[in-house]
């Protein structure tokens, strides 16, 4: 939906869309995303060393670039040094919410109310952040190939990461397919 959204009248949103969609295709932390340059693209792969990973566990992450991610990069080939024309993180997060609202992405999500520690339902466009891209990357891959080690190798998570386990949602369709495998 987002990749093909017509944002011709909103160039600011078009840039946010491109950054967010690219982010959903590569799944890195936003800090790593902002550090990327053209030098991080090698033979159709995005290659980088995660910044937040503990030094003793640090290893290079290689993510094959989807055709749509490559097309987004083509739009910004003349960007100055950086891979994409990044905005300050708070502007990026506000832009993501504005983009989702503009595109009518209003799926209700359950979040934890930090004041009363109760769960509340809110439209995605009110709560989405750059982290939503990382979660989307892991969730989409996990629905296709539920192999935590393979996915973690592309998201930069270390084995046994609690954060990684939170991203993996097992939906009803996955459960249905699993039951159908039983003879």
Name every feature range the model reports, one short phrase each.
Residues 1-30, 34, 88-91:
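Basic, Lys/Arg- and aromatic-enriched nucleic-acid-binding interface segment
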Residues 2, 26, 35-74:
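Conserved tyrosine-mediated DNA breakage-rejoining catalytic core shared by Y-recombinases
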Residues 16, 59, 67, 90, ...:
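Exposed loop/turn and edge beta-strand positions of beta-sandwich/beta-sheet ligand-binding modules
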Residues 35, 94, 98, 140, ...:
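DNA-binding alpha-helical recognition surfaces that contact promoter or target DNA
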Residues 39-45, 146-166:
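Short, polar N-cap/turn motifs at the start of nucleic acid-interacting alpha helices
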Residues 63-64, 82-89:
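C-terminal structural cap/anchor segments
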């Amino acid at each position: 939906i987002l990749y093909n959204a017509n944002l011709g009248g909103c160039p600011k949103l078009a840039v946010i869309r491109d950054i967010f969609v690219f982010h959903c295709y590569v799944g890195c932390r936003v800090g790593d995303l902002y550090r990327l340059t053209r030098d991080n693209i090698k033979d159709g792969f995005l290659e980088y060393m995660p910044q937040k990973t503990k030094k003793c566990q640090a290893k290079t992450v290689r993510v094959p670039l989807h055709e749509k991610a490559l097309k987004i990069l083509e739009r910004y080939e003349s960007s100055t040094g950086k891979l994409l024309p990044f905005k300050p993180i708070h502007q990026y997060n506000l832009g993501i919410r504005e983009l989702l609202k503009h595109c009518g992405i209003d799926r209700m999500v359950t979040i934890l109310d930090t004041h009363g520690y109760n769960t509340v339902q809110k439209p995605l466009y009110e709560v989405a952040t750059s982290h939503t891209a990382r979660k989307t990357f892991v969730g989409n891959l996990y629905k296709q190939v539920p192999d935590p080690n393979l996915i973690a190798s592309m998201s930069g998570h270390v084995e046994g990461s609690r954060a990684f386990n939170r991203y993996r949602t097992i939906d009803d369709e996955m459960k249905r397919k699993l039951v159908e495998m039983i003879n």
